Amino acid sequence: MPKRQDIKSILIIGAGPIVIGQACEFDYSGTQACKALKEEGYRVILVNSNPATIMTDPGLADATYVEPITPEVVAKIIAKERPDALLPTMGGQTALNTALSLRRMGVLDRYNVEMIGAKPEAIDKAEDRALFREAMAHIGLETPKSRLANATDIKDHDRKSHEAERSALKAKLSGDELDKALDELENQWNLGEGDRKQRYVNHAMAIAAQALDDVGLPAIIRPSFTLGGTGGGIAYNRSEFFEIVGSGLDASPTTEVLIEESVLGWKEYEMEVVRDKADNCIIICSIENIDPMGVHTGDSITVAPALTLTDKEYQIMRNASIAVLREIGVETGGSNVQFAVNPENGRLVVIEMNPRVSRSSALASKATGFPIAKIAAKLAVGYTLDELENDITGGATPASFEPSIDYVVTKIPRFAFEKFPGAEPTLTTAMKSVGEVMAIGRTFAESLQKALRGLETGLTGLDEIEVPDFDDNGDGRNAIRAALGTPTPDRLRMVAQALRLGMSEAEVHEACKIDPWFIAQFKAIVDMEARIREHGLPADAENLRMLKAMGFSDARLATLTGKRPKEVAELRNALNVRPVYKRIDTCAAEFASPTAYMYSTYETPFVGAARSEAQVSDRKKVVILGGGPNRIGQGIEFDYCCCHAAFALKDAGYEAIMINCNPETVSTDYDTSDRLYFEPLTAEDVIEIMRAEQENGTLHGVIVQFGGQTPLKLAEALEKNGIPILGTAPDAIDLAEDRDRFQKLLMKLDLNQPNNGIAYSVEQARLVAGEIGFPLVVRPSYVLGGRAMQIIHSESMLQSYLLDTVPGLVPEDIKQRYPNDKTGQINTLLGKNPLLFDSYLTNAIEVDVDCLCDGKDVFVSGIMEHIEEAGIHSGDSACSLPVHSLGTDMVDELERQTGALARALNVGGLMNVQFAIKDGTIYVLEVNPRASRTVPFVAKTIGAPIAKIAARVMAGEMLDEAIAAYGKKPNPRNLKHIAVKEAVFPFARFPGVDTLLGPEMRSTGEVIGLDTDYALAFAKSQLGAGVDLPRDGTVFVSVRDEDKERVLPAIRILSDIGFKVMATGGTARFLGEQGIVATKINKVLEGRPHVEDAIRNRQVQLVINTTDGNKAISDSKSLRRATLMQKVPYYTTMAGAEAAALAIKALKAGNLEVRPLQSYFET
């Protein structure tokens, strides 16, 4: 079936900011879809608010809207662009929910827009729990016993009543009078949303109480139309049940939850399926979760293909998954179907399905090489699978050829519980991981151990771990069983530790329900470790190769034998035990693959020597090291830089080689670089690739500055191995990190720095803190994302930091050296990585500056003014570009100081400087001579691909020459528009965690607001970040004394546009003296009714609150948590409060307009 000719333009909805449950995988799928549809000649319109994505590059779609993804804003885009079709399956849950809202609002019908890829009926049937259950029963497939709790009946009644009122007005009035009456009716309807929602929740809770009697405990609660299991969980008792149901009903846009019988401990599988209009169906990949049911699949360790199914079981599941797609009605694209299997009797039940490209689709694509998103986009416009070629095999096979793989893929999630003190590190059906790593090996053991070291959490393999409450002298088995029975990020290591401590495989299985086959595999690794400890390293190549084929890294072998990793590497090289590289080709080597998508293995065939499929070219080449698994502080922004480096180097005639291990990213797409190695980013793995590539052609160098801290840590090892590093020298990067050397540089350049000190021990830390005085900022050296960075207000806080926080940074090898000596552990760590202390500059303005330098010339690409005060991590701060309150002289001086620093460090490529301005004096906070997370934001705002320019400079071009390759040199100080970047946080995922921001980064993603007006740009940034700014209602104000004068402009604006004001005693008194009427309300500590009650009763629509001192911060924690749970916008800085007030005023005036990114740079 040829492509459709009746469609000319297609709107793609992206996924928006990176959040837990929806990450880079949708940039990957969206980018593939944009390219695939443009390739077919369609006009592509894209909406996505995330500036850090490749898909929002202005050259990818024909019209790129970096606007908030809300139904109202997307409706404006549709009205402006009039697309023929809407593709909602590439942007995760955000895109699906937005598309369904547009349909319900009548927007799609009004503008005659057809939904392609997945019909609305199919989405409803898959996402609506009741419809899905009925559909499965219709085709004879079981689902777990369940009951729905919702408020459908009273919702329908409310909607009909509202429509009746509208009809009555239309019958009675006309013209302007009718329009005014309808607007007033809608306004009243919208104001009553909170009350209606509460009624719906109460009604659904009553149904849930009845359902509990039917389903029993434990019960699994699954909210409808949510992302990554948001709001759901497992209830083991009645109080947990009602708490989780309440949370789920609140999270569900349809106020509906499914209450399901427990299938805890059952085996979990996923099938990735693609179907076309001609009913051709192929299974791309089967995926098996090592963790049993009860852990969200995004938080589970998974393998592909499924390893514990018999062929008969696989065929049953394969047929069932195809039947599910047919029944749901998915006929143009990919879907993933999740199953649970009872290991006792083989009973198979369907858990759910996603009628769209998903996180699992990205994993399946990278695991097999099959480009699911690209094929799905083409199926959506009418093609059938047999009409499309498989790119990986160079067209030797059609897309209808079902992929087969001759290796094992392991995915392990990465968590960030350390960023959220107080969060329970227990895994449930609500997703909590922030990233993932994927590894490929010829055996499960090789794949698993590669994935473990690829996580970059300090693991070298299946490392030892301490069992909580384990007693060597008594019976420790109960402690082990308890640890095994609780799903945590470390459970896999706990299984290995239980086997080391003598538990049988059967006992371990009984405690954790992980399949016995996997436990036997872990036992084989543990037994081999014991042999290595006893006998040392083998002296012959055959046995050493056998250990490497089991996935043992040089570092792990060194730990087991008491040697250094360098000694193991030397022995390995002397015995010529080296990896070979195999290709991922979708066809298990049945056809030759021209696509250089590779992984390493030490496994040898039964006959003859191992054969490498690397086919190293004779070209001049540059290697780019990626960022590894996403984590807070190091995410999609760095992947964006790596992709741009690959694009630029290809433009400049180099062979671009990418090394990365993150399955979610565009950088690990097979066509981003010329050659892709899907490998862990460790010194051992990277150096082996370099050696392989040096066998032919010329290795011009390696780029370590684009992937965040991950590749920077490898710079020293690469340099020692004679591998040229492009751009800024590692010594200059070290100078910027080394407090003593950096201080001398600033003194030489006559630049200011906050009063500071450095501590190499616990005792020295106390002395340095005493000299600087409180408040102060403390952080470990050589970290990214402000890891373990804190503002310290008192001696007791410092003591807590030293004895509670710092021990969490101590690596395993130091802990093992000083098993019962916490101070010894800390001092050993600080001896190499000291603590850095800075005086905390209160009420200072923080500024981020990005620049490019070729060692001589400097181009300042962006000066960003933070809306939060100094002391909030720059990655968590909202900021504007260009600056909005700094004068020309100040900007001139910031440019001068940036240029001086770049030249002094002899920067080749990108550099980021963070300044603080207090009382007219500029202080240098830190310098990062590498890519920063603001690079994509700056690039989108000024209209220049600065990461591409930097890559060419690093390869040897002069700055002006590299800029000229991409058009005219922009002038960031002369923009006719303003951009505001806002951070997005995962606090709702971590109950009990304080939402107060500080110097440790906690955001997972970001959005951009772009407009010619600052207030509207800020408004768009808030809407994009999910903050629904109120147009009417009550603002609650409580600020410290020093902020009372500064809060007045914001309160006057809000009061003038009709907001009521509520305030605590001191603030209410002050506002009254200034002529502003404010209703007094109690603080939480002053007795009830207090402000928290008002927030929970939906009497407050906006909060402005600042606190000072440790006790006040602690006392106001419950207030911050209440605003989060009730989704009330909350501002903690005066600049933020004023920006919000101006934004609300602009929104109320109805001034919000949408424009494509390209239009801002048209001359």
UniProtKB/Swiss-Prot annotation:
Top-level enzyme category:
ligase
Binding positions for Mn(2+) 2 per the UniProt entry: E352, N354
Gene3D superfamilies given in the database record: 3.40.50.20, ATP-grasp fold, A domain, ATP-grasp fold, B domain, Carbamoyl-phosphate synthetase, large subunit oligomerisation domain, Methylglyoxal synthase-like domain
Point out the signal peptide segment. none
Q: Where is this region: Allosteric domain?
A: 1027-1163
Q: Where does ATP 2 bind?
A: R779, S839, L841, E846, G871, I872, H873, S874, Q914, E926
The protein's Enzyme Commission number: 6.3.4.16, 6.3.5.5
Report the sequence similarity comment from the record: Belongs to the CarB family.
User: Manganese: present as a keyword of the record?
Assistant: yes
Return the Basic and acidic residues bias intervals: 153-170
This chain's source organism reads: Rhizobium meliloti (strain 1021)
Any one Gene Ontology biological process term? L-arginine biosynthetic process
**MGS-like domain residues:** 1027-1163
Q: What is this protein called?
A: Carbamoyl phosphate synthase large chain
Amino-acid positions noted as binding Mg(2+) 1 in the UniProt annotation, renumbered to this chain: Q338, E352
